Amino acid sequence: MQDIPREQSLIEYPSAFPIKVMGAHVPGFLEAIVEIALRFDPAFAPDSVEQRPSKAGNYLGLTITVTATSRDQLDALYRELSGHPMVKIVL
């Protein structure tokens, strides 16, 4: 992947970067997402995860805020989250 010159990037690194992850409200979903976040940001605070169940309770929306250190890190994190079988969507 071609690097975007620093002056053209919309994100300044390092920075706190929120990511929304949605999936079925099933046991282990939160823990799986926290485990992934910790692999990409060892300083990630699991107790900082914001949780929002859907109205019917079938889905769970999570907001994780990681310390973004590079575009490559964010791209890899998005790929891993998106590829997880419990995840429906990543924003």
Curated annotation (Swiss-Prot):
Top-rank taxon: Bacteria
Signal sequence region: none
Gene3D superfamilies associated with the record: 3.30.70.260
Pfam families listed in its UniProt record: DUF493 (PF04359)
InterPro entries per UniProt: UPF0250_YbeD-like, YbeD-like_sf
HAMAP family given in the database record: UPF0250 (MF_00659)
Family of the protein in this entry: Belongs to the UPF0250 family.
UniProt protein name: UPF0250 protein Lcho_4239
Organism: Leptothrix cholodnii (strain ATCC 51168 / LMG 8142 / SP-6)
